[in-house]
């Protein structure tokens, strides 16, 4: 994945730019809040919580159904298969799946779903099963970036278009898949570094709780963080890096080891909220107080943003999981023969002590 200065240049023609604008409006207006699910009234904050597309600039690549080799189809008559990668204990995955299901229901589209339960071999067989059950279109939230050849070959044989969300498949756009919809993970890492620099004063030792190996999210969030620290705060030293596998339990275990081996640590960059919340639990268990160690995380879950309100977390960089409207908007346009961007970049917000309490309703 390229950096922001390149990745925001996604759309080249006025029609495609108009499509991106429509996607942004649709994604925002279709966002669901927890109050909606309970039948309550949607808050203003929740109404603003939908995904917004980064303003497009000239220079990006697009895809059409003719170039891809698929067939035109009315989305309302299609069967869409959705493959979720991870156990839905993580609020990000819960919100992501709910968004896909809500949008399919809103549009009256038949949806088949499968959850790989964090097992890559199962995700491959899940998608193959979705194809066997008659999926005309696929939306995939990949667990890993590599190893997708069996699925790509099977989908190509049936001329089934694929849209990937959140994590990238290492394959060729407009040949193996249509579009990739995600945040700019390098930029998320940079913004996390900015918040860490502000919180620590740009001096001292910090640790990184890495996400799981084998996907672009971990690689790029790490890259962005380190680049920004090197650029703006050479006095801030990364002295510890270990994977927490994007889970709260592992994040807690790694942090317990960290504070034993590096008692002078000043900050922890957790590459998702769940690991960050695990770090908070470890600090509480060790008798630390809020603010003793600065924690910066990425995602925007309600528990993490509450952690900012409570003083345990210094900042949260949002990674919005509400992909449903954008994914279906892309599929709808594509199956009608319109050009769609090969990369659709989401514009994320952030939570700090200045806005966390006010914007808590936007969290998921």
Where does each model-flagged region fall?
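Hinge/cleft segment of the Venus flytrap/periplasmic-binding protein
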Residues: 13, 40-78, 209, 213-216, ...
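Bacterial lipoprotein signal-peptidase II cleavage site
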Residues: 27-42
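Flexible loop/hinge segments that line or gate small-molecule binding clefts
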Residues: 46, 146-187, 205, 301-309, ...
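Extracytoplasmic "Venus flytrap"
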Residues: 48-103, 107, 112-125, 142-145, ...
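Hydrophobic alpha-helical segments within soluble ligand-binding/sensing domains
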Residues: 80, 123, 180-206, 250-252, ...
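Short, solvent-exposed amphipathic alpha-helices that sit
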Residues: 91-106, 188-192, 216-236, 250, ...
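Short beta-strand elements at the ligand-binding edges of bilobed clamshell
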Residues: 113-115, 171-195, 208-210, 241, ...
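Hydrophobic alpha-helical
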Residues: 142-157, 225, 244-306
């Amino acid at each position: 994945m390229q950096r922001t200065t390149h990745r925001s240049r996604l759309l080249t023609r006025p029609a495609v730019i108009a499509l991106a604008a429509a996607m942004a409006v649709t994604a925002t207006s279709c966002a669901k809040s927890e109050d909606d699910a309970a039948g309550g009234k949607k808050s203003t904050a929740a109404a603003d919580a939908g995904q917004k597309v980064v303003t497009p600039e000239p220079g990006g690549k697009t895809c059409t159904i003719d170039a891809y080799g698929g067939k035109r189809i009315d989305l309302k008559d299609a069967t869409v298969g959705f493959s979720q990668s991870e156990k839905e204990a993580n609020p990000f995955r819960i919100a992501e799946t709910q968004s896909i299901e809500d949008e399919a229901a809103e549009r009256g589209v038949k949806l088949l779903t499968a959850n790989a339960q964090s097992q890559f071999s199962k995700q491959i067989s899940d998608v193959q099963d979705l194809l066997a059950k008659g999926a005309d279109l696929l939306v995939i939230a990949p667990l890993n970036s590599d190893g997708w050849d069996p699925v790509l070959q099977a989908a190509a044989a049936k001329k089934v278009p694929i849209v990937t969300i959140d994590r990238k498949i290492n394959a060729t756009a407009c040949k193996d898949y249509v579009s990739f919809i995600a945040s700019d993970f390098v930029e998320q890492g940079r913004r996390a570094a900015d918040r860490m620099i502000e919180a620590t004063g740009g001096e001292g030792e910090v640790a990184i709780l890495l996400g799981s190996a084998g996907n672009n999210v971990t690689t790029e969030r790490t890259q962005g963080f380190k680049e920004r620290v090197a650029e703006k705060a050479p006095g801030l030293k990364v002295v510890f890096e270990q994977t927490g596998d994007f889970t709260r339990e592992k994040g807690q275990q790694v942090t317990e080891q960290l504070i034993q081996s590096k008692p002078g640590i000043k900050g922890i960059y957790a590459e998702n909220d769940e690991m960050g919340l695990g770090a908070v639990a470890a600090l509480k268990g060790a008798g630390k107080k809020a603010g003793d160690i600065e924690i910066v995380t990425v995602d925007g879950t309600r528990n993490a943003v509450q952690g900012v309100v409570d003083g345990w977390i210094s900042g949260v960089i949002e990674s919005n999981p509400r992909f449903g409207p954008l994914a279906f908007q892309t599929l709808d346009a594509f199956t009608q023969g319109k050009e769609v961007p090969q990369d659709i970049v989401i514009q994320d917000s952030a939570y700090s002590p200045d806005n966390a309490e006010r914007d808590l309703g936007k969290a998921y």
